[in-house]
Structure formats: structure tokens, C-alpha cells
């Protein structure tokens, strides 16, 4: 009793709650024990901790232990014996129902145990029917194992007990020691006996006799350990006692060590308990000697895996327990503890002769052998069990051999050898600290419950494994008979042994340090095993079976290893028995991992084990698998041979020396193992791969599977046959149990070995060594390994691996991570592991790889393989070029992907091809980089754009788009509402607010579209807006009646103090009355305010000046409203607005002090600064809703002020909502300082970059607003002229995304808008024209359809009736005329083609001519249509300009190249278009402002001429100046033209500047600076003098006069005077011409009709001159007269023979020539004409400025459509503007000069006009529309 108490007090492993009961029970048991009390003081101490743990973990166990203690100590041993059988058959039932047997029964059973011991040599039938002849221990082992049969891996008693306890008792207990387990087991047994007395009794009877001897020996060593209480505790745990004879003794000896470990067992895995149990058997105690199945074993018997954190004692506890157990074990098992004895025992056990083993150590060996002989499978399983339990576990193994071996794939052949070896290893280790360490591994081994499942799993796996059974790898250590289906062929397995032998040599040196690891018994045996394996490895390919056999003989640890092995061996177990021999040899390699390390199994068994254990220690358990892998790769090859992974040859060649310690695929095994067996067993490289040198790279993989299993065996051996091997096999659940304890030791010992194996297996050097293999391995090996892994995993291995390994994987995460590196055996086992880099990814536990190759293989093998493949391929060197490219520091000669992004979303890509080139004398190929295939693809195929559910219906042209637009807006709103806030915006406090406001902005636009742009007059629109601004309001207010509203207020009124002040003070009212009596209303008001009589004050103030009223309201708001509550900002602002304090209303939301950055403290409310003064911004919705629901006169100003306030605080969307609803917002360009909105949702005032202006959503939303306010609202004018440029940007973005058809539609829409606008804007500048033209041209080039070019226009014309257009042109006589009259587009096409030809020939002259001709024609028609058609003219001009853009688009290729040069061409080809462009910019303003707007339009023509001159100038070089100027102007949209030119300097007609000022307002200031300069001067002068006169005469006449006048300006500085004279002449000539033409029109019906209406020739004949007053008859008669008119080619006009004045206009041409030369100069930028122009331009400039684009617009009217495109750039030339009209003569006369003269003459005379029309008669027709001679002139 004293000892037990001491033990209890001494054992730290006991848990506090268990210490008392367990101590009592153990004390009783110790007292009852014969020798155990004295011998097992240490053991008891150690055992009692385990008992405490058991009790602590399982409360019922304590209680049962107490019962069993009360029953008697002797019963415990008997009961233990009974438990042994029970563990076999009824371990599950016992575990499940431990309490069923009565205490008496348990006692009786305990009493039977001595009998079992006595019957050690007798055959004892177990409940399972197993009969063991050798010894009671063996019999009991068989019996115990029979229950374990379902769980072959649950060989460690402690682990099993713990697992059982965990599973059934709900407590997670780590059996620190066998003794501890026994003491607890006594309680458990007592409990179990209570639960199932009959069963235990039977088993006890059978096993008692067989186990009495063994248990007696154990009792002699450690009586307290085997005391009945411990046995009872075990039984209570539900763990049957394992009756082990000699094996039990060895186990007890190991248990002693395990018990030392068990001190730390609470911290360690159940393996510590297992080891302690093993050590206790080494002790002489009978009861303690009786090895009870560990919880894991019992669970294994139940085929249940218990994963309890307590099941595995901490490594330190296991070590401590082992240390304690070792001394006790030394008493009886000193031989076993000695390494020599251990080696002998192992050899005896390994040899299939059980009789050879000594009774103590020999007895253990004999028992092991007997057990092995009896049941190879059982021995294998028992070996696993023994790994955890130790020699006692060997008995368990026997039972397991009987039952569980059948289940475990590798039970029969190899298990017997292993269990024996492990007990021996445990015995030698027990005496030393290695025993303690072994105890820790034992705890790791304690993961037997897992092993149980694994065994069952392996049983399931057995069928598939048979083919590749590697029984030899594991089982053959102890017995060759066992073979695992995963084992490589015998050839491979044997070479592994040989390698193992070599490893043994290597490992032994390394093992020298291992003795410390040896502290954990397991590490040492692995060393022995490793010593043995080298021989098998060496003989791996030759005779794997025999070498494995030797290896196993050397390795006592393999028995413990079966547990871990079942996990890994589960793969091999299937065909362990017969087929295993050859394949098992592959399987032995798993054992070999440890055996390989030992090298010579038998000879080195004893001593080598400890050193080898230390070898693993040398490797850091947590050391990187990759790093160790490299050094250990050689070892891996040796071991690998056994596994025959791809590395057999490779590994051997690569790292055979290092590999001995591990079982990396040995080179020999590589040869044979490289064959299918490795594949079958592992997903390792194919046999050929392993054989290949390249396999060396993958050798880690090949060897890694082998090494992994060998490691498992090695660990088992090194760890006293404890589950340490399982630990390398960390995958299996047994590993999990054993890992906690093993990992420390196994990490040190086995872990390093595994690391070595991994190193050997995946040696980086190996890969490099066989570069060819790298390429081969990546593909072949990867596929091979994947296939192998798949079969292995898919087969029974998968079941076991999945069931067991996966648990290990689960557990390994916490343990394997550190183990993973040390115990990368899994990595070494699987070819994947050979890939170090992959393994880290594959193995979450460790960066280097999964702890278990099996696990890794199953889940990761496929992925790792590709990764591996890639890595090797990357290692290959490139063949450097010899042409100097090799000096490129960027090494571009190696090749790189090349991408080129083209127009229309096209992407051209080219990837380099890396071709391996082999050369003589090189093992690895070298890479030759060659260009790959060039592919053309669409960007959308690579980066598909995020398209909404609904596609945008743009461009928005008609009302039919409304429905689609609403649907698109709704889809976008839904997307915004469901989208998450970007991460980069989440830091912003206003991110959520901005998101809501953005959604609200889109909703407002949707309401605007739904209500056709009208919000004020519609009740539905008002309701919709209210619901948006107040989503929570909805119908809450309508649901309340007025009565309801007043009722509550009435009830609250008595409580409302504010209502009282008005009537509270009667004296104040009297004073007020007196003041009013005196007539001092203002004084009365402020008195009432002071007295807070607000009603009085407001009534009186309402009769006074508004300022007083506003002040009163302001005071009321500040003193009453603002202080009432905290949310009155919106109400206060609204009252301010009602009072008329519009600008001050925002002060109620955000005080000025806050806007100034100050924080004011209120002295009244006392709130201080608690409130954020900026919170008032959040009231903007309420304020907006109040204002919209209660409109007041100036509330729009208040909304604008509110919007500006919000904008200042970066609340852009909210500000834009206020702007939109105010209806007073200004939309404009970025350069407009007055613009409130440029794009909806974009703050143009705070642009960090221009990227925001390219946002498609903002552009499209703004387009939707424009659509709602213009198209849907019925407005014919675009309200947002600046938006065209953004639409062009959007069109470009569409083209970039490959949506070219939509981009073309936008181009067409922009061109149509430019033509349709009646009031050109400064934003309609040359850049816009050129941009549209260029994009259209590129789209036409990349698409088959016509696009928006002039070609498409004819097609459009065809749609409208191209035949009629041709017929009309034919009837009219001039196709160009008809074209121009019929439709600017078609007309321009024909004439343009002609004109373009001329300009093409000579751009400068042709431009002048063209512009001149067009201007003339345009001037004539425009004048005719000018007033009525002026806007249309400007509209026409724009259309013309686009048309000309298109017409010139035929020349787009030239123009598109660059604006400068193309402009020249375009101008040359179409000068009129340039004028048109000018008109678009300035014409309208000029027209609008000056009465002579039409004439201004004519001057703009002259400006067009300047544009043409610009083109010409560009040719001459002078144009560049103007053009560049123009460019600058265009950049500044409004003033692009004028600014370009120096018209302002020319602006000598400062008088006109006043005019310009007038027109300037029209332009809005865009063009004023620039456009004014160039175009206005001429137009201004013409407007000033001739314009008035011309207007008096006729609009058209005025135009010609203007032109002539301007031509004069163009000609020279005298041009002004000449212009005046010419204008007078022109007026007269025009009048005469009108008359003559009228007559001619009457005479010639053809000419009049087309000119008049531009309709059909019929209309021309019949109604062409109807405007003039010509009748059908008179027309015919006049037609004859018209014959008097002839076209003078020199004058380029019609000359009336009858009218001598007709020739005079021709004379007028000379002045223009003078001017024309200068104009061209002016165009070119020459000073001469510009001065002339300059004089007018100033006037024009000023005039143009007024119109902002005034100068240009006039020109537009002057030469409407044709010049617009080309003209815009030339717009700069001022003289030309005048000359432009005149240019018609230029064709006949020299370039520009003819224009002015011609234009003057033409303008002044009908002939001139007619001449111009011939050049381009379109304008003439237009003039005719005006009802003038235009038609005749055109003809």
C-alpha cells in the first residue's frame, strides 16, 4: 500500500481525479501481488499515473478500478488474463459495455489470469477460437488480438485502451504506460468483467494457463504495474487484457519505460500508455505483467478508431514512464533491454522460430516467433500493436494475429517478426533513456484504435493490395511470410534490404547520436531495422523477401510499427501473406524505412537500433523535408529498392549512402521496384523511372513511398517496436495516437530518418542528376505516380489510407507539420514526396509534403505530379545564341509572350516555343526558344467585358428606345444595389453614402425618362420622386387623416411648452399694441421677436419690406427651429427658402463656421461639440424633398446652392441630383467655369485625372438625361452639345471591345447631330469632326459594311430613293446641283468627288477652288435660304461638314493619318466643308446676333475659305500655322478657329467687334477668342456695310456681296472698298440676274424646279420658280429666253448675253484675284491677304466672338455642308472666308484670288452665282429655295 501511494504521489501521469481511486486500487493490487509491489514501485508509480489518466479520462474506470481493487488484487491478474481474450473477441463489446461484468466476475477472471500464466505453454483456445501453443502470453495475445482482429493496427495495448476509453467511456485518456494501463486496466477489467464476466472468465481460463508464466515473470519485475487494480481499470476501460507470455514480458519491460513516459502520458499520445504497458510486461509483475489490450487495441478490436487527445500521452510523459518502467523491466527483462538481447530476440522473432527466443528476452523472441509462426498476419497486426504496447503488445499481436491479422492486409507474413522485434527493441531501450523515448513513441504508437480501423481498413484493402502486397516491407521484418499487396516485387524488396544494410552502415554511424532518441525505444529499433533493411535494400531487386526477412529480424520495432504500418501497410496488407513475398518485399521497404536505416537487420539489431534512432534525431524533426531529402536521397534509393519506386536505380545512384538510414527507393529496388509493384504500392514512378537515372530526381518520390513505409518500420523498430513506425506512417490513425508521443522521439529519431528518407526520396540533387528524367519524370512519372496513387488509393489502400491515413492527415496537421519535415516518410513513400516543392503545397501539415505519402498521394498526387513536372522542366538550360543576343541583359533571346492590341478589340499574340535539344555528352536536354504561332483573337475572348443582363440600347435616337432604356437603367440600378463596396473605398467614411447616392441618381434619371423628361407638372412624377427621396415615407402620411394628425398633437399640446410663449405674457402684448399705436411697426416686430412672440412678429413683418420678413424668419429658425430638436436642419433650411433667404438656406445645414473648418460651441443648448456640424449634409434629401413638395419662387436657386455645398464636400451624386431637379443647372464642357455638370456622377472640378471622363456609365447616364430632356420632351435641339465628344469617346471604347457595329452607329448619330443642329456650338469643333471621320474610316476598313462614310450615305440615299435623286440631278442638269439640293449628303458626294479630285491634284489651289466653288454655290443658296434657312444652313453646314468628312472619307486614309495633313487634303478636296465647320462653330452665333446673320454665314464661308486656305496653307506650309492655331482653338472648343488665326490683329474693323460682342453672347463664349479672330472679321465687315445693304436687297444677294466684300478683304487691304463697290454692283447685278433668272427659270423649267425645292425635276419644272412668281407658261417662254444665258468657263458662271452686266461680275473677279492671292496667303498664314482679311476679321472677330463661334457659323452658312469637314481646320484663314465665297472663280482664275473676285462677282450677279453652282451647284439650289435666283444660278 505504501508503494502504491508513493507511486500515486510520485506518478505525475495520474490525473488528479484519478489519483485517489487509482492509487487505492493500485495499492491493493500491489499488496496482493506477490513480487510486484517491490519490483514495480517505479512501474507502479508510472502505472498509477496512467491509471490516474485512465480514471481521469474515464470516470467510470476509476469507479471500476475501485471496485476491482475491493475485489482483490489477485483477481486483477486473472482478470487481466481474461481481459486478454476479451480484448480479442469482445474488445468492442467490452469497450462499449465495460460495466456489464460484475466486480465478482472480474475478480474471478483476474483469478483466472494466473492460470493463464501457468498455461503459458499450453494451447489456450481464445474466444475467437485462436489457440496458442507457445505460451499463455502468446495465447492471450492471440486472444487479445482476436478482438483486435477487426482492428489489426490496434496492437498497442495502451493506445487501444485509451482509444477504447475514449470511444466508450467518453473520456480521452492517454495510456502513459502499460503498467498504468494495467492498473487502470485492472479497474477497467473489473468493470469489464462486471460487464461481461462470462467472456472474461472464458478468456481468462484459456489464457491464464498460457499467460501465467509470462505474467508471473512480469509480476516479478513490476508487480504493482500488473496489479489487479490496473487490470481492472483496463477492463473498466473496456479494454480486454492481453495475455502475453514472453511477449508480454518484453512488453512489460517496455511498459516500464512507457510508464516513465506515462508520467507525461497525459501530455502524450496513447502510445506512451502503450509503451508503458509494454514496459510493464517487461516487469515481472504478474497482474501488471498481464498485458491488457490498450484502449486503442480494444477499439481496434471493435474496429473503432478512437481519436482522443488524451489517448496519446505526451512524448515526455512516455519517455518518463518508459524510464520508470525500464528499471523495473530490467529486473526481469534486462536481457531484453540490452540492445544485444533485443537484437537476439528480434533475430529470433524475425527468424520464424519462436522457440529460439529467450524466455525473458529469449522468451519474448520465442513468443514473438511462435506468435509469428502461428499467425503471420496476426503478428503483423500485433507487430503494430506491439509497436505501441511493446512485448505485452506482442501477446496482443498474437491475438490480433489470430483475428485482426486476417483483417489487416499484412498481418500474417510480417507481423510476427515485427512484434517480436519491437518488443526486443523496447526491452533494450527500456533500460536506457531510449525507453522513455520509446514510451513517447509508444504513445504515438498508442494510436492503435486508429490502427484497429486501419486493420479493418487493411482487411478491406487486402484484396486490392495482394497483387502488390509489400508484406515483406513491414511484416517480413519479423516474418517474411507476410506480404503486402503494395509491396514491390520480391526483387525490389530484397534490394531494399540490401540498401537497408548499406543504410545500416550509414545509419549506424548516424545512429551513434540516436541513443538519446533511443530514449524512446522505438527510435533504436528502427535503427536496427534500418541496419537490417540495408541488406534487403542491397538485395532489393534480387531477393526482396529474404532481405526483408533479415531486415525484420534485425528490427524488433516492426511489431509496434504494424500499427503505423497498418496505416501505411494498409495499402500493402491485402496480399501480405502469399503474394506478398515478392511484392511484400516492396512492402517491407515501408518497414525498411526503419530497417534500411539499420542496414544489417540481425547483426546490428541490438546496437544499431539506438544509433539509428539517433540518426533520425540528427535530422531535425521539423527540418525541411526538402533539405533533408537531398542528403538522404541516397538512403532513399537504397530503401526505395525495396519499394521499387521509380528511383531504385536512380535512387541508388543518387544517394544510396544517405538512404541506408531510410528506405528511400534503393537503386536495386529501383530496378525491380521500378516495375509495376512500386506503381501498385505507390503512386511512385514507374519501374522504368525508378530504374532511370532521371528517377533519382523522383527517387524521393519512389523512395519516399518506400522510405515512408520503411520509415514506419524503422520508427517502429527504433521506437521499441512501438507505434513510432506508425508515426512515420503518420497517416494512419495509430500514428495519430502514437504521433503525440512518437513525434518528439520519432521526430528526433524516426523523424530525422523520415526526413532523411524524404531527403533521399525527393533529393533535389537526384532530379538535377537526371535532367532527362526531369522531363520524363514530370510527364511519365507524374502520370505513373498519379495512376499508382489512384490505384493504391482507390484500392483497399485507399480505404485504409483514406480511413486511416486521412485521419492521420487530420491529426498530422497538428503533429505532422513538425513531423512532416522530420517524418517526410510519407513524402519519401510517395513519388510526389520526391518533389520537395510540391510536397509543401501538397501537405498542409508541412510545407514540404503531407505527413503520409499515402495521404498525399491520394489527395495530392495528381496535383503534385504536374507541379513536379513543371519544376524539372524549368531547370533545363537554354541554348544561348551566338549572334550577340546572348549579351542581352534581359535575356530576351529566351523568348517571351508577345501581345499586340489592335483596333476593334483585335489581339495578336505569339508565345515562344521551347524545344528541348539533346546533344552528345549531356544528360539533360537544353532548351531552344523559337517563335511560336501567331494568333489573332478578340480581346473579349480573353477578357470578356462585364456585360449587364440588359444591353444598352444606344445610340438613343428616337422615342422607341424609351422602353429599352428604362430596362437598362433598371438592370444597372439592381447591379449597383447588389454590388459590394470596393475594398479601396471601404476606408472612406462616405463610401456607403456615396454608393446610395449613386443609386439614387440613377433612379432619378429613370424617373425622368419614364416621365418624358417632365417632373414638375405630373403627379405621378412627384410621387415617384418623393418615394425615392423618402423611401420610408411611402404611404405612411396619406394613411393618416388630418384628424389623426391633429389628435395626437392636441393631446400633446398641453405638454408642449413652445406654444405658450405667445400668450403667456399679456404685458408683452400690451407693449406691442402700444408700439403699433405709435406706428412703429419695425420696433414692434423686433420687440415681438425679443419676447418670442413669433406669430405677432411675422404678421407685422409680412406687411413690411421683404428684408424685414426674411430677418424675422431667420431669427425664428435660429431660435426656435434649430434648437427644438437635433434633426431640424432640413426644416430650418426650408423655412429659410420660403422666407427668400435662398443663399443662406444652406447655412442651416452646414454652418459657415464648419465650412471654414471651425468648430463652434453653442452656449445655449450646452451640447458643446458633441454633434458633428457636418452631419447636416445628411439632411440634403429631406431638404430637397421639402422644396420639391412646396415650390417657391426662387427655390431653384436654393437647390443649386445646396448642390454646390454638397459638391464642395465631394458628394458628387447628391449634388447632381439637386442640380438636375433644380432645372437651373448648367451643362457644359470641362473648360466652362460656369458649368455645374459635365457628366453625371463625375466631379469635373476635382478630377485627379481625366480617366473619370472616360467612364462609360457616366457617359451613358448623361446620354439618358439628354434623351429624356430632348427627344422625349419633344425638343428638336440637342441640349448637351458638349456630349458629342463624349459619345465619340464611348464609340472608341466600343470599337476597342470589338463592338464595331455599335461604334459605327454612334459615329452616324454624332454626324447626324452635327448636321441637325441649328445652332452650332463651340464644342462642334474640328477635332470632333476629324475624330468622327477617322473612327468611321477605320471602322469601314475593318468591317465589310459601308459604315458612316459617304459611301454609306449613298446607300442611305438609296433607301430614301437614290433613283429619284439621280433623276432629279439629271433633270436639274447638274448632278452636283441636284445632289446638293436633294440632300446635302448625296449632293456633296457627287460634287465632293469632283472637288476632291481637284484638291487631290493640287490641294492648295484645288482647296481654294473647291472652297471657292462651294462657297459660291453655298453662298448663293445660303443667301437664298439664308434667313429662313440660316439655321438649317448652319445645320446644313454641319451636315455638309460631316458629309464632306464622309465624302472626304474616301480620302480618309490620307486624312486619317493625321489631322494636320488630312485636313489639308480634306480642305483641298472639300473646302466648303471647312466653311461648314466654321459655320457650325460661329455661323450660328453670328447669325443669331447680327441682323445680317445670313451674311455672317457668308463671311464664315470666307472663313471657310480661310479653312481651305489653311489646307492650301498646309500644302504651302503656311497652313500649318493656321491649322495649328486651329488645333489649339479646337482644343479650347469655343475659340478653336479664331484663336488659331490672328484675325484679332487683323481686326482693323473694330467697329465690327462691337457686332461681334453682340453675337458673342450667342456663342456662349466658346468660340469668341479663336473663332472671332479668323472668321468674324470678314463676316463682321460684310455684316457692317454690305450686310445691311445686302439684307435690304436680298439675303442671297447679301451673301454674294458679303463674299465679294470679303473677297475684297481677302484680295487686299483695299478689299473693303472694293467690296463695298462690288457689293453695290453685286446688288444690282443680282437684281438683274434675279430677273433674268426668273425669266430663264420660266423659260427653262428644269433649272428653276430643282433649284427651288431640291425635289424632283418635276417639282423644278412645275414649281421650281413658284416662289419667285413664275408661271408654268411663263416658265416655258422664259426657258427659251434662258438660252441667252450661257456658262462662261472662264468666269465659271452663267452669263446673260442680253445683260452686259453679267460680264461685269467677271471683272469683279480680278479684285478677288488680288485678294485671292492674299487670301491664299492668309490661308497659308501669309500676311498680305490676312491684313485685308484682318481688317474685316477684327470686326468679324468681335462679331464672331459675340457668337463665340460666330465667325465659323457664318462661314457655315456661306458654304454650308461641303466645307464643314475640311473647312474647320482652314477656318483659320480669314481672307479665305471672304474668298471662300468668291473661290468659284479660282477654278478659272488663280487659286484664292479668283474666289474673292468670283465670289464677289457671283454674289453680285446671277451669272457669278450660276458659275459657282457649276463648280458646286448644290448651294445654288439652296439659294433657289430661298426663292431667289438660286435655282437659276445653280443651273
UniProtKB/Swiss-Prot annotation:
Per the record, GO CC terms? endoplasmic reticulum exit site; endoplasmic reticulum membrane; ER to Golgi transport vesicle membrane
Single Gene Ontology BP annotation: vesicle-mediated transport
* Location relative to the cell: Endoplasmic reticulum membrane
Q: Which Gene3D superfamilies match?
A: 1.25.40.1030
Q: How does it sit in the membrane?
A: Peripheral membrane protein
Record key words, sorted: Autophagy, Endoplasmic reticulum, ER-Golgi transport, Membrane, Protein transport, Transport
* Annotated segments matching region Disordered: 33-295, 378-866, 1040-1068, 1376-1404, 1422-1485, 1512-1682, 1695-1835
**Which segments show compositional bias classed as Polar residues?**
123-133, 153-164, 424-459, 682-691, 741-752, 848-857, 1040-1059, 1516-1533, 1553-1562
Does the entry feature the keyword Membrane, yes or no?
yes
Task: List where Pro residues composition bias occurs.
Answer: 512-526, 655-667, 1728-1739, 1760-1772
Q: Where is the composition biased (Basic and acidic residues)?
A: 138-148, 473-482, 708-724, 1588-1606, 1623-1656
- Chief localization: endoplasmic reticulum
Q: Where is the composition biased (Low complexity)?
A: 624-638, 668-678, 817-832, 1447-1458, 1740-1759
Family stated for the protein in its record: Belongs to the SEC16 family.
**Protein's job:** Involved in the initiation of assembly of the COPII coat required for the formation of transport vesicles from the endoplasmic reticulum (ER) and the selection of cargo molecules. Also involved in autophagy.
Q: What is this protein called?
A: COPII coat assembly protein sec16
Q: Which organism is it from?
A: Neosartorya fischeri (strain ATCC 1020 / DSM 3700 / CBS 544.65 / FGSC A1164 / JCM 1740 / NRRL 181 / WB 181) (Aspergillus fischerianus)
- Report which gene this protein is encoded by: sec16
